[in-house]
Swiss-Prot record:
Listed PANTHER family: NUCLEOLAR AND SPINDLE-ASSOCIATED PROTEIN 1 (PTHR15874:SF1)
Domain of life per record: Eukaryota
Taxonomic source organism: Xenopus laevis
Gene Ontology BP term (one): mitotic chromosome condensation
Protein name in the entry: Nucleolar and spindle-associated protein 1-C
InterPro entries: NuSAP
Keywords: Cell cycle, Cell division, Cytoplasm, Cytoskeleton, DNA-binding, Meiosis, Microtubule, Mitosis, Nucleus
Disulfide-bond pairs as recorded: none
Region (Disordered) residue spans: 43-203, 250-293, 373-398, 452-525
Compositional bias annotation for Basic residues: 82-92
UniProt biased composition (Polar residues): 58-69, 113-127, 270-285, 476-494
Keyword Transmembrane: no
């Protein structure tokens, strides 16, 4: 690798010096002055011998700096590579200055600042010219580079001053037509403060835009009328077309024919003329669509309306209607339908006679058998049976006391056989519940002597009675339970079937005591 000259080393940037130091094998993480010194010593070791008091900058530069500090008031710091690009440039726009201060600045103040800036630039130019005169001829390369940088800085300064002068002239000069200056226009306008809008006015404006209800209803009615009129027109047209088709298809003879009823069995058939009733002529055949549309659902096509809808409640006694066969009324007796769920037996109405049954006891009779109608009055049941004794008439039976209940043991059956023959008698036990009237339902007064004379239904207790609820039978049970828990606290005692059985017995005993206490009128705790 070729060794760079001293001027080249001084002209290199800091990053390039670091790369060079790395390639050579020197430490690159140093300051710019020290790094340049190390590189010079590495490439030119004789420079160290010639100038033993070399401190990171040449003696010539030190003397130059001393002379310049003596001659000038403001010292110029000489640095080789430490300056970054753009450090020396001043910003074109000063963002830190607030707008209010800029607005408050008058036109005269702007002109004074411009004059002071021009003086400063002239002073800098003079200093630079002096520096050129003082600088020795040995450092030509450095001065060339400095002069280049100074020329560029001069050009930048001139450009900035020209721009500022233009701005100042724009502000001072009267605004041209259509061009308002940047900040003068804002000064004239007051700052708009955020204020709440007047909602009342806004609502009124919206309400005025809205349509009134009357207008809306009129518009709606018109729309409905137009739609409904078109629909009605279509309906009328379809009806007319259907009627025309029917008139064309059906002849006059078919139209005048009567409609047959569904129940043709009850009414006589009219004489059929022409085609058979089973077949329909071709001109009468229509699709189901037209027939369903033309005929109403509620229209009843059959002329016959039956008066009797169910046969369960039909009157079968034709003799009442005709009023003939009155002498046969006793023979023709059809029983009226009664529900078997309710049975009312009064002392006036007696049960029915049993049919003659030899050597057989009757089975349990249903309630419907015992139902007696006032029309059909059976033979009376008598308490005793005696031959050739006159029977009691229904009138006499009615005269008997209502409070007395009949408890017959036997039933006499009147038969058509002669009287000299014996009649088979079957015992009958009356099990039906008689409805008690308010007269029979009256309770008599309690007779103490009669109740004491009656034998007891239970065996009375003999001896001294225990105090009620005072003694506890199962006192030791709780202690045992506690002892069990103490002994087996690691494994708790699980409830077994025996325990459940004992608990159940105890509950039953408690219920029994409670019922006995309530029956005897003792207050149960």
């Amino acid at each position: 690798m070729e060794a760079p000259t001293l001027s080249e080393l001084e002209g290199l940037r800091y990053s390039e010096l670091q790369k060079l130091a790395k390639t050579v094998g020197l430490k690159a993480n140093l300051k710019a002055d020290k790094l340049l010194k190390d590189l010079k010593v590495h490439f030119y070791p004789e420079s160290k011998d010639e100038s033993p008091d070399y401190d990171g900058g040449s003696s010539l530069t030190d003397t130059d700096e001393l002379n310049s500090s003596q001659e000038k008031d403001e010292p110029v710091s000489v640095s080789f590579v430490t300056h970054r690009r753009g450090r020396g440039r001043k910003p074109l726009k000063n963002h830190d200055t607030p707008k209010d201060e800029f607005l408050s600045v008058s036109v005269g103040a702007g002109t004074e600042s411009l004059a002071s800036e021009t003086d400063n630039t002239q002073h800098q130019n003079c200093l630079e010219s002096k520096k050129k005169e003082v600088s020795p001829p040995t450092i030509d390369n450095k001065h060339r580079k400095r002069s280049r940088s100074e020329d560029t800085s001069k050009q930048n300064n001139l450009e900035t001053t020209e721009k500022r002068q233009k701005k100042a002239s724009d502000i001072t000069s009267a605004p041209s037509a259509g061009k308002i200056p940047r900040y003068v226009g804002r000064l004239s306008k007051p700052e708009s403060k955020p204020s709440t809008p007047n909602f009342k006015k806004l609502h009124e404006a919206h309400f005025k835009k809205m349509e009134s209800i009357d207008k809306y209803m009129e518009r709606k009615q018109k729309r409905l009328d137009t739609v409904s009129s078109s629909i009605q027109e279509m309906k009328m047209l379809t009806k007319k077309s259907n009627l025309l088709k029917l008139v064309e298809k059906t002849p006059v003879s078919d139209i005048k024919k009567p409609v047959k009823s569904r129940l043709s069995l009850l009414s006589s058939l009219p004489p059929t003329t022409g085609a058979s009733p089973s077949r329909t002529p071709t001109n009468q055949r229509r699709s189901g669509r037209f027939s369903a549309a033309n005929k109403s659902i509620l229209f009843d096509r059959s002329g016959f309306k039956p008066s009797v809808l169910s046969s369960s409640k039909m009157n079968v006694r034709f003799s009442e209607a005709t009023k003939d066969n009155e002498h046969k009324r006793s023979l023709i007796k059809t029983p009226a339908r009664k529900s078997s769920s309710f049975l009312a037996i009064t002392p006036e109405s007696e049960p029915r006679q049993m049919l003659p049954n030899v050597k057989k006891t009757p089975a349990r009779k249903s309630l419907s058998v015992l139902a007696v109608t006032p029309e059909s009055e059976p033979k009376q049941m008598l308490p005793s049976v005696k031959k050739n004794e006159p029977m009691t008439t229904p009138e006499k039976a009615k005269k008997t006391d209502l409070n007395t209940t009949i408890q017959p043991s036997t039933v006499i059956l009147e038969s058509t056989c002669p009287q000299n023959k014996e009649i088979a008698i079957t015992p009958f036990k009356f099990t039906a519940q008689t409805t008690e009237t308010p007269n029979t339902n009256k309770k008599g007064k309690f007779n103490l002597q009669a109740s004491l004379s009656r034998p007891l239904g239970y065996q009375p207790h003999k001896g001294k009675l225990k105090p009620w609820g005072g003694s506890e039978e199962n006192k030791c049970g709780s202690n045992n339970n506690v002892s069990v828990l103490k002994n087996n606290f690691k494994q708790p005692h699980l409830q077994t079937r025996e325990d459940r059985r004992k608990q159940h017995e105890q509950d039953r005993k408690g219920k029994r005591d409670q019922t006995l206490g309530t029956r005897r009128g003792v207050p149960v705790q």
